[in-house]
């Protein structure tokens, strides 16, 4: 329980490990997480909510790893990202949107690497890049600036934007802009949602 009397979390333990449905609440009483566990590992559907009650993310887990479609939303309810995972690794179509709903990125991933067509857009809706990859190696590309004029290189398109998506130790997925990580995170997933919410409050 929180100091203000609100319930913090609730769930079952089996042999000292989380088992079955666990629920975590924000300190303001809003539900924060619903996650299913098996032998202490997430297994099944996990849903996260913002403090305002808006859904933050939803995805399936298998034996402690995200598996299947993972979807994230902005706090205003607009869809932020949708990605396909296989045994904890990105695999398949990955899509991102700006907060106003304009599409930002659409790319395909195979075995953790870009494979096939990859397209990005500026916030004004104009296309920013069209690239074709084969297992992480870029084979063809076209770039434009935010006015729709052709750009000779990705760096010319307002300071550069590459599709190096990385997952750091904390499980945060970032798009990198030049040499520094992009300031807005795509979405996050955690090996233990209960610990995540405990540290956030």
Indicate residue ranges for each PLM-predicted region:
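Glycine/tyrosine- and acidic-biased, solvent-exposed loop/turn segments at the edges of beta-strands
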Residues: 1-201
């Amino acid at each position: 329980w929180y100091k203000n009397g609100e319930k913090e979390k609730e769930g079952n333990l089996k042999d000292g490990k989380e088992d079955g449905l666990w629920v975590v609440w924000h300190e303001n009483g809003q539900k924060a997480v619903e996650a299913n566990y098996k032998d202490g590992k997430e297994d099944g559907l996990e849903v996260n909510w913002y403090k305002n009650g808006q859904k933050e993310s939803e995805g399936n887990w298998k034996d402690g790893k995200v598996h299947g479609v993972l979807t994230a939303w902005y706090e205003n309810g607009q869809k932020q990202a949708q990605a396909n995972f296989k045994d904890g690794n990105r695999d398949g179509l990955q899509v991102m949107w700006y907060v106003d709903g304009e599409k930002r990125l659409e790319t395909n991933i195979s075995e953790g690497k870009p494979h096939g067509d990859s397209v990005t857009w500026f916030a004004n809706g104009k296309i920013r890049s069209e690239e074709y990859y084969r297992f992480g190696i870029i084979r063809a590309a076209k770039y434009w600036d935010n006015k729709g004029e052709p750009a000779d290189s990705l760096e010319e398109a307002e300071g550069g934007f590459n599709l190096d998506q990385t997952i750091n130790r904390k499980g945060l997925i970032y798009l990198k802009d030049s040499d520094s990580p992009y300031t807005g995170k795509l979405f996050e997933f955690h090996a233990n949602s209960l610990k995540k919410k405990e540290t956030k409050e």
